[in-house]
Regions:
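Soluble catalytic domains of membrane acyltransferases
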Residues: 19, 27, 36-150
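Soluble, non-transmembrane catalytic domains of enzymes that act on hydrophobic metabolites at membranes
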Residues: 1-10
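N-terminal targeting/anchor module and adjacent flexible "hinge" preceding the catalytic domain
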Residues: 10-30
Length: 150
């Protein structure tokens, strides 16, 4: 299946037991490191469902946002899947991790972009968590907020 401007679409990514185990190892390592370098207080934790799927939508202002936004869900036992631009899945190390952890690639501006929403919906319907940064990129200038979804 081809994506935007002839780019080869990424294969559909499905969670696996080994990927989930790696997610837990990396998540716990990130959690420990995060607790060492930052004083973390999770406000609104009670709003995360104890059962059933859900979507977290957040602004994307720093490169630490994925860890920061996923942190409460991870602490509550979820392995949230991110919708992320497909180029991240093509990076040598990060791409391997993104694919292994079953995050969801978005091929912007193509018919394949719809597939990412279908995948996200399946995850939520199966009781999982999905994280979306609607801007699709980071922005450091509050004057540009609210950004338009891409």
């Amino acid at each position: 299946v081809s994506g935007q401007q002839g780019k080869q679409a990424l294969p559909e990514i499905e969670p696996t037991a080994s990927g989930d185990a790696l997610y837990k190892v990396l998540g716990n390592a990130a959690r420990g490191l995060y607790m060492l370098i930052a004083r973390v207080e999770i406000a609104g934790r009670e709003n995360l469902p104890k059962s059933g799927g859900y979507i977290i939508v957040a602004n994307h202002t720093t490169e630490l946002d994925p860890v920061t936004v996923a942190f409460p869900a991870f602490v509550e036992g979820a392995l949230p899947r991110f919708l992320a631009k497909d180029s991240l899945f093509r990076a040598p190390v990060l791409g391997y991790i993104m694919r292994k952890l079953a995050h969801i690639p978005v091929v912007r501006g193509s018919v394949d972009a719809r597939k990412s929403l279908i995948t996200a919906r399946k995850i939520v319907e199966a009781g999982g968590a999905v994280i979306i940064f609607p801007e699709g990129t980071t922005t450091h200038d509050p004057q540009l907020w609210p950004m338009q979804a891409r």
